Amino acid sequence: MSLRIHNTLTRSTEAFSPIEPGHVRMYVCGMTIYDLCHVGHARMMMAFDVVQRWLRVSGLRVTYVRNITDIDDKIIKRALERGIPIRQLTDEMTAAMHQDIGALGIEPPTHEPRATEYVGAMVGLIEVLERNGLAYRVPGGDVNYSVRKFPGYGRLSGKSIDALRAGERVAVLEGKDDPLDFVLWKAAKPEEPADAKYDAPFGPGRPGWHIECSAMSHALLGERFDIHGGGMDLQFPHHENEIAQSDGAFHLGSGHSFVNVWMHNGFLNVDNEKMSKSLGNFFTIRDILKRYDGETIRFFMLRVHYRSPFNFSDAGLDDARSGLRRLYTALEGTAVAPAEIDWTDPHAARFKAAMDDDFNTPIAVSVLFDLAGEVNRSRSAQSAGLLRSLAGTLGLLQQEAAQYLQGGSGVDTGHIEAQIAARAAAKAARDFAESDRIRDALAAQGIVLKDTPAGTTWVKA
């Protein structure tokens, strides 16, 4: 196939070929669900939503796993603060996540495992690492991974093990043989609630974060799979430690690794600064959905390549909204011929070439604008159908154009229609001052009225 993907492990863009012909298995690190998802989470899930969509468009069967971390120090702390069971908190936050990302058109994965459902698999994996001489128990009940015993540690992140310093994104715990070692099993603390403790041969406790993903990916995708994704911030230590665990358990001396292609999306900033609650620029998905519709947010994110740094700003969102409206305006009032995509069409061929080049959505979006220009000139039903179909592979332009242009920006359509009716009544009564006042008030809200022989219509400016 013609698809090429940038592999973080090799630092090169490579031709992609799945291990099993015709079937792609992909794992993406999902949310730790103690709070609402923020726009950085949205950026990550959007990136891999596009990946899985394009793999399917390319004729491949996709098994897509995106996990949920539902046991963690932050989760325990938040549940205690609220005085509720951990499961109640994580169920609530999972439902909120599904609602929020659904508004952005992010499709559900094939499997969405919760870490707490795989604790037995995690315990079994830790026991394999013990037998392989890579894990050791310490007084108090913790089990740690011996980093220096794993050959090749640091190859994903490019970090030399001797150059790594204790404390560089690695928690230093008492009882470690080496400051770089990381925890596989955390012994229970007396003050922790009962629902944070699980039984294991090492003693009661809970799994470390890193072992969770190794166990879940192995349980659902097997010892080797095609793509592992996540945010750039997970490259070290999380993904580095996953390699140490999974390869240390199943691939020592085999010449293979458990993942063929590692993908990482770029960092997100807000107004060119790191997103931080202390800076007052921290936004949840829900915060943004109060001001912009989900498709505008999606379109905004797809105008930047998934590996590039992404600057989140109101100016960028406003520009994206205008751009999306231009695309929908091209479809407004034009018959749209439903049809399979003809990939030999020049526009379709350019779109495919862009997406096959490491999912280059900015170039693909530029093709949509070129095609919209052709639709505006020709009013061709076939061109309009192609525009909608190509955009649909990205999760865009699937609403009726008139409906989106009127209501796609979260406006109160009932209020607007009532104001239009009031304006019509004022005009009929020859109260032109009132008619103009209503028109101007709507214009101030970004609503532009169009008077036609058939009546008054409106669009969001």
UniProtKB/Swiss-Prot annotation:
UniProt KW NAD keyword: no
GO cellular component terms listed in the entry, alphabetical order: cytosol
Biological process, per Gene Ontology: cysteinyl-tRNA aminoacylation
Domain of life assignment: Bacteria
Cellular compartments annotated: Cytoplasm
Keywords for the protein's UniProt record, in alphabetical order: Aminoacyl-tRNA synthetase, ATP-binding, Cytoplasm, Ligase, Metal-binding, Nucleotide-binding, Protein biosynthesis, Zinc
InterPro entries from the UniProt entry: Cys-tRNA-ligase, Cys-tRNA-synt_Ia_DALR, Cys-tRNA/MSH_ligase, CysS_C, Rossmann-like_a/b/a_fold, tRNA-synt_1_cat_dom, tRNAsynth_Ia_anticodon-bd
Residues that, per the record, bind ATP: K277
This enzyme's EC code(s): 6.1.1.16
Pfam families the record matches: CysS_C, DALR_2, tRNA-synt_1e
Motif 'HIGH' region, residue range(s) on this chain: 31-41
Cofactor mode of binding and number, as noted: Binds 1 zinc ion per subunit.
Reaction catalysis annotation: tRNA(Cys) + L-cysteine + ATP = L-cysteinyl-tRNA(Cys) + AMP + diphosphate
UniProt motif ('KMSKS' region) ranges: 274-278
Annotated residues for binding of Zn(2+): C29, C213, H238, E242
HAMAP family: Cys_tRNA_synth
Complex formation: Monomer.
Name of this chain's protein: Cysteine--tRNA ligase
Record organism: Methylibium petroleiphilum (strain ATCC BAA-1232 / LMG 22953 / PM1)
Organismal lineage: Bacteria, Pseudomonadati, Pseudomonadota, Betaproteobacteria, Burkholderiales
Encoding gene (name): cysS
